[in-house]
Amino acid sequence: LSALHEPHTQKGSTRCIIHPVCKQPVRRNTVTEYAADMNVLLTYYKCRDDWEDEKKVTALGYSKVLQGKVKKLDQKYPDKSRRIQKLLSELSEMEKSGEKDIDKMAGCFGKIMEEIFAWKQDVWEDTLRRMGFFLGKFIYLLDAYDDVEEDIKNKNYNPFSEQYIIEGFDEQVRRILIMMMAQTCREFEKLPIIKYTDILRNILYSGVWC
C-alpha cells in the first residue's frame, strides 16, 4: 500500500521490546499506522476467540490489554471492523462445526484479507480486494497444510484432515497454492507501483514459498 499510494514517510529510530537497548530505524506513514491498526483488530478478536473456545487465560489477558485501543478502532473504522468481526465469527463457527469445504473456509479468510487490503475507496480498490482475497486464501491453505499432521495428532480441526491420507495429497495442495499465488500476482501486476517493485515481486514470486 505504501508503494502504491506513496504517502509522506517519516524516518527515525526507536527502542522496542525486542531491542530495548539499541534504537532501531523505523519508518512511519499513514499506511503503516493503518496496518498496525488492522493488526490490533485481528489480534484482539483472535484472542477473544481463543478465550471463548479454549479458555486460554493468556488470550483473555492480552485481549483486556487491547480492549481500550480496539474501542477506538471500532469508532475509527466502524464498517471495516464490523465486517472483519463478522467474518472471523463465521470462520470460527465453521471450524467448530467441522466444515469440510476447503474452498469455503479459505474463502472466508480471503474475505478478511480483502477488507484489510481495501484501505481506500478509490480506483484501485477492486484490484486490491482481489489481491487480498487470493493472498488470504493462500495464507489459510498454506497454514492448514503446514499444521495438518500436528492437528490430526492432537485431534484439532483442519480442513485437510480427510484429504491428508489420499495419494497425491501434497501435489494437489501444491497446485492449489500455485493457483492462489498466480491470481494474487496477476492482480499485483495491474497496480502502477514504481517503488519497491523488485522487493515486492521477490516476496510474491519467491519469498512466500520459503
Language model features by range: what are they?
Residues 59-63, 67, 191-205:
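Long amphipathic alpha-helical coiled-coil segments
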Residues 1-27, 34-64, 127-150:
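Active-site alpha-helical segments that house and flank conserved acidic catalytic motifs
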Residues 125-128, 202-210:
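Histidine/acidic-rich helix-loop-helix segments that form or flank divalent-metal centers
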Residues 98-142:
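A mid-sequence, solvent-exposed acidic-amphipathic segment
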Residues 17-38, 67-108, 126-129, 151-191, ...:
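Divalent-cation-assisted or electrostatically stabilized phosphate/pyrophosphate-binding catalytic cores
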Residues 52, 122, 141, 193-197:
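Intrinsically disordered or highly flexible coil/loop and linker segments, enriched in small
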